[in-house]
Amino acid sequence: MTVKLGDGGSGEDGLKKLGKRAADEESLEGEGAGGADAAEESSGTKRDEKTPRAGADGPPAPPGAPQAPSPPQGSPQDQHHFLRSSVRPQSKRPRKDPPSAVGSGNAGGSGPRGKGAEGGGSSSGNVSGVAPAAPAGGSRSSSRNLGSSGGEKEEGKKVRRQWESWSTEDKNTFFEGLYEHGKDFEAIQNNIALKYKKKGKPASMVKNKEQVRHFYYRTWHKITKYIDFDHVFSRGLKKSSQELYGLICYGELRKKIGGCMDDKNATKLNELIQVGATTVRYKGRNLRIKAPMCRALKKLCDPDGLSDEEDQKPVRLPLKVPIELQPRNNHAWARVQSLAQNPRLRMIVELHRKVSSLIEFLKQKWALHEVRVRKTLEERQLQDSCSAPMQEKVTLHLFPGENCTLTPLPGVARVVHSKAFCTVHWQEGGRCKQSAKDAHVLPPAQILGIQSGQGTARGQVKCPRSGAEGKGVGRPPPAADALQSSGESSPESAPGEGAALSLSSPDAPDRPPPRHQDTGPCLEKTPAEGRDSPTREPGALPCACGQLPDLEDELSLLDPLPRYLKSCQDLIVPEQCRCADTRPGSEQPPLGGAASPEVLAPVSKEAADLAPTGPSPRPGPGLLLDVCTKDLADAPAEELQEKGSPAGPPPSQGQPAARPPKEVPASRLAQQLREEGWNLQTSESLTLAEVYLMMGKPSKLQLEYDWLGPGRQDPRPGSLPTALHKQRLLSCLLKLISTEVNPKLALEANTISTASVRPAQEEQSMTPPGKVVTVSSRSPRCPRNQASLRSSKTFPPSSAPCSSGLRNPPRPLLVPGPSSTGSNDSDGGLFAVPTTLPPNSRHGKLFSPSKEAELTFRQHLNSISMQSDFFLPKPRKLRNRHLRKPLVVQRTLLPRPSENQSHNVCSFSILSNSSVTGRGSFRPIQSSLTKAALSRPIVPKVLPPQATSHLASAIDLAATSAGILSGNPLPALDTEGLSGISPLSSDEVTGAISGQDSTGTHQDGDTLPTVGGSDPFVSIPSRPEQEPVADSFQGSSVLSLSELPKAPLQNGLSIPLSSSESSSTRLSPPDVSALLDISLPGPPEDALSQGEPATHISDSIIEIAISSGQYGEGVPLSPAKLNGSDSSKSLPSPSSSPQPHWIASPTHDPQWYPSDSTDSSLSSLFASFISPEKSRKMLPTPIGTNSGTSLLGPSLLDGNSRDSFVSRSLADVAEVVDSQLVCMMNENSIDYISRFNDLAQELSIAEPGRREALFDGGGGGPAVSDLSQ
């Protein structure tokens, strides 16, 4: 009944379509592929002939026949086709296996192909092409012959093609392509073509895309009748997924037992599909068949394609990648910073390196001095069992960057490093490490995405691995198996995933299985978290402390106090469960309760540390107590879980076993990694390449580091022998001693921390003090000590108590508020702000963390950044800064420029260095004084008057020589200018010039107080009184102050200062007397203020210089000056010397130059001007006061002060001279010094007579006495 389809194309088409339809009916497929199929196949002759008969004897055409439901064109043909495909018995299938058909496969252009035969072939043998006209009976042999003839025809004329026959090799190749590419016919065909090409087979034998598609559907239809689609496995799957999974499982079964399908094999096929593994008895052997975790199935499990890329093909990565390490928290930052290392680390690493090698490197790089000392001690004395754990109490962990997304990886077989690339090879078949056992553990259905929650197949199937959270979470033994097997390989990936953290498999190197707690914690962690953690409170924490905390563990390398307390506690409560103490909040105050809060924290900390949760306590022992407690509070769930897990790790492990896989989605894995990171153990088998892939091949690897207490790694029996505790205590004490920890400090911290409520204290006082302590504990380090010394200098006296409390030479890096003063009122921020820089830092002069200092900062620097002043690299030391009273920011007005002084603008001094300037306070004084002051306190009135006179004259000379004095007359501010100023208290940081009475006459009694030696800072009087000074800049030109009304001085002379005077006023020369030994004509005796000899600074020098015409047109000297009138005497004492009027010319003030000046903006320039009114207010400080806390150095040459020495007390002058000289030495450039020297020489050479004449000519005053006397 074979119907010969004529060669006529239409007949063939009809048959083809019919065949397709029949296939469609048979198949559940419903795919329309058949239509296309038919179209292509239409070119080939179909043999319906065989069909009817085949119905009788041929194997049923496998539903897999690609025919799609195309409408039947010839009803008889359609019917025949249907009969053929549906009726042909399976028994005949094998007969199609003959390889002979292979040749005919593609070649046969004319020979119609029996679909039934092909279908059968799909199951076992090749399909032989059947001659188009061949009767069914002879179809087989004739088909072969025809096949070959068809091949010839095909080559000669490609009009017809014979139905291809599929040899076993072809089928094997097809299934390989199917495993790899899934339902991608073109990719499968390319795979086959490539294989044939390699083997040198003719292109005619290569199956084309349509043939591949047909074979796919024929095979599928063949097996659909055996698949139980009602099973839960198939319910949630799309039809394409069912096909793919069914065909892949069938292909696996076919490999082992052949493609013959009978009831028995059908059952096994269903089992394989639904469970993922089955056992088949074949030829006397039991064969274990597992669903392959091939790429195609992974795509099903991981529709997002997370694992797609990495699976089969080796991934080529760059050889090296930049890596950036940042501290995970303040504790980590402080630890590295305290070592004078940069907490941010960038380096280029080779991807084939293990993460553990990176950790080891960092561990050595950032090893604490204390650790080295400890090692030495342990080598010598602590050889016993305890010593080893002690060393590892706090371990370095790396964590993925905060913003990176983590993707679990499939099992990595190996990472190969070559010259060009770093290549990551996946485990065979792209199988996840755990897949082997996991696959069975989880039914394929789940793998396929029924449990899509799991994430990538590897993540899912390999849950244990990626889900290491479940981490071996006690998977059932089989799972455990899988874990182990995968664990062996997976440790790498596991750690890589980090989710596994090696925890995934108890075997994982990270934690020896023996330590249930270690693994348990992880294992349990998931379950425990699910169960316990959420419900538990820290108080309720199971006693993780069952293992008494390791003191070492707790001992924060950084904070001596907690360590000390902990050690004491250890002694006190050696066998008690600390957790209990902590929970109740009742701690046994090791130090008489003072430390109780801290102790608590440590305890909880310990618990946390001990708890496998190490990560949650991450702050770990090393962290400040507050951090610990905070962690406890924050991560109570985790810690609790973990702690709880340790409590019952084994049980948890067992229980979670089944569910962990499901519980561990990729997100969970990522979270786990973020919580636990990688340490030396967990990352031993993890390469940076895996981390790189997990993070999605970023341009640079961003990792964070922290030190976590591996207490969890040390699950110790609940009660350790008391002897052990004692030993530990002793070792702790040794360590403390070795690290030079100051117990007093600890006590202070204790009391402080105790004072505050535990939570509050943790946040505020505890953290700061703890951190401070931590930092200070590093004292042994030399550089640190230096830093501390610097900081100590920096500490204001108020901070002194603090510093004394922190006796350790090293200063705390963090200024959490004065630790001793009471950190409670400090910001209380959780994170201390680093104040002290590493020893080599050029900011070594940072402001020291004294409470008072902070207050003053805040008060004074409200609107101004305090750092402008403090962080500038300045030589001067702000030792006495704390003395400074709150500074008032003064408004500075621009003086009205007077017409004649266009170029004198240079007379502003930029006080960038001055402490005041940063704050925006107006200060006409040379900041140089501050330096001097910092360098050494100025002793008021100590200098001999003659020195003062020296200074004055020297200053004048210097000013003139330096060109500071402008030729243009700058009217000296009238004494009136000083009148408004009330004397500043000695405390005030800025010395004020003693104010003159409003009348503007200087009274001898009013001599300006000298700057208090104690406060070297030169700054503007902080008092608001000064504020007006700026206002005074009434129309005076920038360079020259408006001519002040000449107020009668005591002597009755009005003192219009000559420009030279005014300029000198502006000058703030440092102690010139010290710099230069210049002998100038001595001042007239009457000029000496208050009878002190040579007090008056001869302005004559300046005037001489001016008269010489060096500095512009000569200005008539003020009569007071010439006469040696009181005005000259009224020179304000050095403290007053910084008379507001005086403005240093930029040339004179080194700060004027950008190099030293903080701010060269106009505002700063203007700030340097002082209006006469302000000057008045600024000047008056009682003579006697040493308070001239900060010299207004510039005012040494203050116009009034210089001209009228009278009002200035010699002591003041001496102080000023000294301070100013020091400033000049410190701040002024060498050029200036050399200028002064030159000036001195000139003066010495110059005719004294001429100078005197000048003086006389100007005012007829007595010649200035030689200052050098």
Swiss-Prot record:
Biased amino acid composition, Pro residues: 59-74
Gene3D superfamilies reported in the protein's UniProt record: Homeodomain-like
Species this chain originates from: Homo sapiens
Record domain SANT: where: 161-224
Annotated Basic and acidic residues bias: 13-24, 43-52, 151-165, 508-518, 526-535
Gene behind this protein: CRAMP1
Major site of localization recorded for this protein: nucleus
Family: Belongs to the cramped family.
InterPro entries linked: Cramped-like (IPR055315), SANT/Myb (IPR001005), SANT_dom (IPR017884)
Name of the protein: Protein cramped-like
Comp. bias (Gly residues): 1-12, 105-123
Region of interest (Disordered), ranges: 1-165, 450-541, 581-666, 757-827, 976-1034, 1055-1092, 1115-1157
Compartment(s) where it occurs, according to its Swiss-Prot or TrEMBL record: Nucleus
Keyword terms: DNA-binding, Nucleus, Phosphoprotein
Transmembrane segments: none
GO CC terms, sorted: nucleus
MF terms in GO: chromatin binding; DNA binding
Composition bias type Low complexity, residue spans: 124-147, 485-507, 1055-1070, 1125-1140
Residues modified to Phosphoserine: 307, 1268
GO aspect biological process, one term: pattern specification process
Sequence ranges of Polar residues compositional bias: 757-767, 774-806, 982-1002
Taxonomic path: Eukaryota, Metazoa, Chordata, Craniata, Vertebrata
